[in-house]
Amino acid sequence: MSQVLDARAGKITPEMEKVAADEKVDVEFVRAGVAEGTIVIPRNTNRKVLKPCGIGRGLRIKVNALIGTSSDRDDRQMEMRKIAAAEAAGCDSFMDLSTGGDIDEMRRLTLAHARVPVGSVPIYQAAIEAIEKRGSIVAMTPDDMFAAVEKQARDGIDFMAIHSALNFEILERLQASGRVTDIVSRGGAFLTGWMLHNQKENPLYEQFDRLLEILLKYDVTLSLGDAIRPGSTADSLDGAQLQGMIVAGELVRRAREAGVQVMVEGPGHVPLNHVETTMKLQKSLCGGAPYFILGTLATDVAPGYDHITAAIGGALAGTVGADFICYVTPAEHLGLPTEQDVKEGVIAARIAAHAADLARGNRQAWERDLQMARARVALDVEKQISLAIDQEKARSLLDGTGEDGVCAACGTNCAALVAARYFGMN
């Protein structure tokens, strides 16, 4: 049985109970959301997730971190340190995007070390192995693609980004209209090259039922990869992107009918005036499926600060519909991230998620902000630190900054102290 089929049968699973307790909502609310497809709980039947999370309507916005080796840097111990740094910073899930070294071993290490759900992009491994065995990505076979999905599912991957919502109709629209940045999704580029070279339809689209059978077998959550997400603000909301949303919506319905949990990925670089339209279109076209967004990067001109551009766009996107934010680090567009980059990316995404949760009326978010406000008025340093999104940084700045009962920033002229003294406010 899958989470979806259990939910439709009226059964409440241990994962649903954990999500409900964490979110402080009724477990029946979670069960109903899983049953109708507006909530997913990534969890492979071959893996015990110590900290499961629910993603979707009525729940807190979650944050995903990326790790993985590459041909330029195959340092598995560094990736383990990144996992520790990201979990300490409060991420809700990981995706292993490894393309270098022993990909199987890296995945198994990630699954063993991470306490949260772990995702992957199987087409990466299929493509790299095609290069190693046959000299070219376009030499992949459909069986190679599905074998990678099966192997990673068997190992315990909880959710997979799979670019099924890409077909020749979308590519023809893209070629006819043109783009500044064409295709920036790596998986999308691999498949596009394969399709155009071989003049064959995307197997992950054409044989979608075959894919669903594998995912259902292990209760892997399908994350419909956004193969043609905009790579620049100039390309946002073009015809190809909209056609991709329509196809994704059709596949969401088929996945739900098969009993497979499914969410949809987007959007990349999106100017702020396009964010609300993008979110509402996706929710409408995809039947309210959870929306998993990269960023959203609100401008193209801030290399070195793209964790900030992504937090700006991500906060707005979360406010109007996004459910799951994939972090962006300061190294985006510049190089491979360090452990510190990973931490800063998670913190920035968590700030965006929390700000959006406030705007959405999430009670836990509002209670946390209220407690922080009270702690500041009371000059309760320890309470302020415990409530901070980045507790380590808050402690480094607040510890030893002044006497007890004296504001660290304002001293004896603190507005809160003056107000309390003369107006009896506290």
From Swiss-Prot:
GO biological process terms, alphabetically, are: cobalamin biosynthetic process; thiamine biosynthetic process
The EC number on file is 4.1.99.23
Residues in the signal sequence:
none
Recite the UniProt keywords alphabetically. 4Fe-4S, Cobalamin biosynthesis, Iron, Iron-sulfur, Lyase, Metal-binding, S-adenosyl-L-methionine, Zinc
Which reactions appear under catalytic activity for this entry? 5-amino-1-(5-phospho-beta-D-ribosyl)imidazole + AH2 + S-adenosyl-L-methionine = 5-hydroxybenzimidazole + 5'-deoxyadenosine + formate + L-methionine + A + NH4(+) + phosphate + 2 H(+)
> Which major enzyme category is it?
lyase
Q: Which terms does the record give in the GO molecular function aspect?
A: 4 iron, 4 sulfur cluster binding; lyase activity; metal ion binding
Annotated Zn(2+) binding lies at: 269, 333
Q: Which residues bind substrate?
A: 95, 124, 163, 185-187, 226-229, 265, 292
Is DNA damage one of the keywords? no
The residues that hold [4Fe-4S] cluster are 407, 410, 414
InterPro entries membership: ThiC/Bza_core_dom, ThiC/BzaA/B
Query: Could you give the cofactor binding note from the entry?
Result: Binds 1 [4Fe-4S] cluster per subunit. The cluster is coordinated with 3 cysteines and an exchangeable S-adenosyl-L-methionine.
Q: Does the keyword Transferase apply?
A: no
* Cofactor(s) this protein requires: [4Fe-4S] cluster
Q: Which PANTHER family match?
A: PHOSPHOMETHYLPYRIMIDINE SYNTHASE, CHLOROPLASTIC, THIAMINE BIOSYNTHESIS PROTEIN THIC
Q: What is this protein for, i.e. what is its function?
A: Together with BzaA, probably catalyzes the conversion of aminoimidazole ribotide (AIR) to 5-hydroxybenzimidazole (5-HBI) in a radical S-adenosyl-L-methionine (SAM)-dependent reaction. Is thus involved in the anaerobic biosynthesis of the benzimidazole lower axial ligand of the cobamide produced by M.thermoacetica. Requires BzaA for catalytic activity, as BzaB alone displays no activity.
Q: Which family does it belong to?
A: Belongs to the ThiC family. 5-hydroxybenzimidazole synthase subfamily.
NCBIfam families on file: PRK13352.1 (NF009895), thiC (TIGR00190), ThiC_like_1 (TIGR04386)
Name the UniProt record assigns to this protein = 5-hydroxybenzimidazole synthase BzaB
